[in-house]
């Protein structure tokens, strides 16, 4: 009897560890919504099978903001694969073509940039003018939306150019997607025959080289983990990230997180997305 009593005491002694463990992903998302006084949309999808692992408001609309730039460069690469575009083609532009936040393109007014360089600038530095120049090559917002329909995404829509597309007005369906649709589209671009293997590798590499996502999931990523991502932001209470993650330096899952309608500061939005990412990673490791 004494032995049994000691075993029970030993077992109970371990329970506080479970009580004080980090919250499960959905618990963290609900906590984030409460702290943000806004809405969170999220999906975690297995890259190989397309199976949904975790989801919250996954079929609700959220502003894409700059996360659309991954899809845009996917559309550009599809044109390259079809022989209608070349990554080496030089595009020249003028001062009046520049919009706010163009840290790369503003330095190349004299010499222009290639299509490939514009894609790199749009994804790795979120250069808005680079995105607009690329958008013109695929037929503008309507052309990009048509590309989405062609690959089976009947939800995601782009209606405006940079920087107006970041307006993120409450209830506005323009320039929006759902976490589920964005994840499915990203998976198609990276795993199906919509793009050649070479173009898939190039799109993924641009996301790996992202240089403006440091405060989000990258800030909580364990050593040796893979990440490729693209973020988006709006002054009107929205923030977002699309990412591929995995241990052992392999892309195994797609994670899409969007926030909207929050009065929280950008730093607070970043912190909440990082917290959701940390909860997903910890749950994954169990």
Swiss-Prot record:
Example GO biological process: beta-lactam antibiotic catabolic process
Presence of keyword Signal: yes
Gene3D superfamilies recorded: DD-peptidase/beta-lactamase superfamily (3.40.710.10)
NCBIfam families cross-referenced by the UniProt entry: bla_class_A, SHV, SHV_LEN_OKP
Active site per the UniProt annotation: 66 (acyl-ester intermediate), 164 (proton acceptor)
Organism name: Escherichia coli
Gene Ontology terms for molecular function: beta-lactamase activity
Annotated S-S bridges: 73-119
Chain positions recorded as substrate binding sites: 230-232
Domain of life: Bacteria
Note: The class A beta-lactamase family has a specific amino-acid numbering system, sometimes called Ambler or ABL numbering and often misspelt as Amber. A multiple sequence alignment was used to derive a consensus sequence and then the consensus was numbered taking into account insertions and deletions. This allows use of identical numbers, e.g. for active site residues, despite differences in protein length. UniProt always uses natural numbering of residues, hence there appear to be differences in numbering between this entry and some papers.
Signal sequence interval, chain numbering: 1-21
Keyword annotations from UniProtKB, A to Z: Antibiotic resistance, Disulfide bond, Hydrolase, Plasmid, Signal
Protein name: Beta-lactamase SHV-2
